[in-house]
Regions:
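Glycine-rich phosphate-binding loops of nucleotide-dependent enzymes
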Residues: 1-200
């Protein structure tokens, strides 16, 4: 089996500070890979490079055996690399559905969607409900409730569901259990297992 994601000799400096020094990794389909190290070891920088938020000074990234380079997280997402950031990058004042489709809204068919850009809220809600159900997040009763009303573990679940909903090949999670209790941490680890079982 060939690795889905390969990083070779990735380096990044900020002035004289070396944030990442010749980092290498191989990730295979369905593999869960943990990156561990001391504070300041470059873990977050590596994640930011792999998801397109930071451009490395040197090195290369291969996705499905092809060399890729990203100038933004949007480019990485387009190629199938999704990220669940430590802060989750959710908007608390928006609903679960709105957060899952933020920046990727489904428009209505025909004139209303094409020219007036009306959103297909029903299709988005159905898809959000389906994704949350696939990940076993049935404790969320109302798909339209605001994210700010959810527990930490439920918010993490929404972020994971969003990351796995759009043709994803790789999901990168930055400290997925940070600031969560034992029960919520266990549920997040179960979510990771469920994502892995889907071959992501």
């Amino acid at each position: 089996m060939e690795p889905i994601l390969v990083a070779k000799n990735l380096s990044k400096k900020y002035g004289k500070v070396v944030a990442l020094d010749d980092a290498n990794l191989e990730l295979y389909p369905g593999e869960v890979l943990g990156v561990i190290g001391d504070n300041g070891a470059g873990k977050s920088t590596l994640i930011k490079v792999l998801c397109g938020a930071v451009i490395p000074d040197s090195g290369e990234i291969l996705l499905d055996g092809k060399q890729v380079s990203f100038t933004s997280p949007i480019e990485a997402r387009t190629l199938g690399i999704e990220t669940v950031y430590q802060n989750l990058a959710l908007s608390p004042a928006l609903s679960i559905t709105d957060n899952m489709f933020l920046g990727r809204e489904i428009r209505q068919k025909g004139f209303m969607g094409k020219f007036l850009r009306f959103l297909d809220k029903k299709a988005m809600a159905e898809e959000a409900r389906k994704r949350l159900s696939e990940l076993g997040l049935l404790t969320i009763q109302n798909i339209n409730q605001l994210v700010e009303t959810l527990s930490g573990g439920q918010r993490q679940g929404v972020a994971v569901a969003r990351a796995t909903s759009f043709g994803t090949k790789v999901v990168i999670m930055d400290e997925p259990t940070a600031a969560l209790g034992v029960k919520e941490s266990r549920r997040v680890l179960e979510l990771i297992g469920e994502v892995r079982a889907r071959g992501i």
